[in-house]
């Protein structure tokens, strides 16, 4: 295999309504919109990560994205719940992460996770 270095991997999400998606990602999740973006294609950025949004193209609704973060998942859960974000799964402690799932306006799922809580039992599905 040829040698190469991956600099970044950033998802491109198909959105049906750019203003609605920008409201969700910017006003609710705290991303910032790129200066060069327009009504059909843009890049939203938070910390050192970005997600591309493409109106009516490049992808399917229902894409899942892992978002690893450093913070209190229970505080984030309460904040998003109070903002009427669709919560698909409340925080659960797994062996790989303490995580929860939320849904954006186009049905894409953001799987938000942080380090597992080793002082608590792991979720086993029962």
Which sequence ranges carry the predicted segments?
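Amphipathic alpha-helical segments
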Residues: 19-32
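Short secondary-structure junctions
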Residues: 30-35, 86-90
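Vicinal oxygen chelate
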Residues: 1-4, 8-16, 45, 56-126
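Short glycine/proline-centered loop/turn elements that form peptide/ligand docking sites
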Residues: 20, 37-42, 95, 118-120
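N-terminal beta-strand motif that seeds the catalytic metal site of vicinal oxygen chelate
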Residues: 1-22, 63-65, 116-126
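Conserved short beta-strand elements that form part of the metal-binding/catalytic scaffold
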Residues: 32-64, 109-115
């Amino acid at each position: 295999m040829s040698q190469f270095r991956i600099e970044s991997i950033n998802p491109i999400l198909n959105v049906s309504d750019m203003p609605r998606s920008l409201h969700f990602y910017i006003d609710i999740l705290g991303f910032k919109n790129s200066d060069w973006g327009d009504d059909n294609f843009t890049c939203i950025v938070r910390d050192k990560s970005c997600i591309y949004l493409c109106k009516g193209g490049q992808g399917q609704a229902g894409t899942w994205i892992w978002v690893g973060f450093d913070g209190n998942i229970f505080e984030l859960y309460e904040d998003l719940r109070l903002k009427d974000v669709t919560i698909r799964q409340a925080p659960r402690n797994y062996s790989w992460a303490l995580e929860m799932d939320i849904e954006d306006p186009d049905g894409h799922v953001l799987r938000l996770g942080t380090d597992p809580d080793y002082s608590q039992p792991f979720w086993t599905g029962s």
